[in-house]
Amino acid sequence: MTNDTQTTNTETTDTYIPSPSDWVREQVETIEATGDTRSVDIMGLPVVLLTMRGKKTGALRKVPLMRVEHDGVYAAVASKGGAPEHPQWYANLLANPTLTLMDGTASWDAVAREITGEEREQWWARCVQAFPNYAEYQTNTDRTIPVLLLEPVSAG
């Protein structure tokens, strides 16, 4: 089988590349089979599904994340369980901030934007309220865990 299409950082492809992580891949497969993010959870808590473009390949990448929502805006917390490095999806969203967000059976286009300062502090409190382990994750790493807002793209 040959691949006649090559992709650079600025090109995109509709090819979906599953995660190398077993649990991520299995959760994505379950969500896609059921058409509903409520078919899976992380530690008993609800998730949303982000579909984005890979930074290096431009291919579609999918990741389930903890559901943190306030007034129709969602947050994505790049905690990676308090690991010393950021998750790959964070680099993907910085490079290609447009994404599709799925919550339950609904999905829509959104744009990711990293937040800092007072805005981050306000959202960080919401994130910790939604998933208290985030506070512990922050104490386990020297990096400031990034928070990105996933703001809906208005139609029109």
What are these regions (language model features)?
Residues 13, 79-134, 140-147, 152:
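Short, structured beta-strand-loop surface elements
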Residues 1-43:
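Extreme N-terminal tail/first-helix region
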Residues 3, 150, 156:
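Accessory terminal regions of nucleic-acid processing enzymes
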Residues 70-72, 106, 155:
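Short strand-connecting beta-turns/loops that link adjacent beta-strands
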Residues 42-45, 138-142:
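Short coil/turn segments at secondary-structure boundaries
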Residues 44-79:
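Short beta-strand segments
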Residues 39-40, 66, 91:
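Short secondary-structure boundary/capping segments
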